[in-house]
Every structure is written in structure tokens, then in C-alpha cells.
Amino acid sequence: VTLVSGPVSLPDPTGVKVVRIETARQMLDAVQAALPADIAVCAAAVADWRVAAEAGQKLKKDGSGVIPDLKLSENPDILATISQKGPKRPDLVVGFAAETENVIEHARAKRARKGCDWILANDVAPGTGTFGGDHNEVFLISGADGASDEVWPRQGKAGVARALVQRISRHFA
């Protein structure tokens, strides 16, 4: 098992190779270096955009009220990249979707757009208590038609992780 992780304050899991990264490009490179693999669980919330050119130092206010003009560049799409057909594609690619409206519809569209096998989606709209909260209601989207979608009970993150491991085990049984 290889864990590609950005900066966190959590201890490394026992028995896991941990690769530390700081940028989306580094994450993509590390994930690709870990392939081939049977399963890829892509849970990181990688930003869609990055600053095109780093300033190299803090951009300080000068009192003029002029806001700096920041140009953005698109970050690599890690989930879509590893979901592409090819000899190193994992047998099962799982992505995540945090949605604020039309959760299942948007998750189905994301699954199709990215080319992954499953999407675990949750509703993060204000009032759900998901952001900053301890519990999630999760939807497993595993087909285009909705016939194989699953609604998981509201549970903590550790419970969601256990349920995902059990679901993956059943998939490969």
C-alpha cells in the first residue's frame, strides 16, 4: 500500500509506504510512480487551479489599494489521468465528490467525465454539518444508470473508510 499525502499532522499508518508531496504536480508524479496497482482510492481534494507564477516572496500591501493581478493555471487532473485506459490503469479507480446541490446527478456526471469506476459523493451544502463535522452521508455511484448506486448510512469518517474497504473486498470477491 502506498499513501501519497500532502502536508498533514497525522501519524503515518503502520505498514504503509508514505510519499509526502506539496503540489498537485508532485501528487500526480507520485501516484503515477506507484502504478501499477490493483486499486486507486483518490480521496485528496486537490485544487483545480494554482498560481501560474510564484512571487518568490510575500506580496505586501503598498497602501495604494491596487489588488495584485494573479494569473492562474489549471492543475493536473489526477483522477482523470489515472482512470485512462492503459496497461498501468488500476483494476478499480475510486474518486470522491463533495457537492452542494444535485449530489447524485453531479457525482454521476463526474464519474463519466473522469472515467473512474466509482465515485463516493457527499453533500457538503451549508446546514448539512459535513464540513467541520464528524459525520457524512455518502452515496456510492458505480454505474451510469443509477441501478447500482448505494446510499450509505450517516456515519463518521472512520466508518465510511471501513465501509469502503468492505465494499472493495466484495467487489473483488
Where are these regions (language model features)?
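A cross-family phosphate/adenosyl-ligand binding-site feature
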Residues: V1-A173
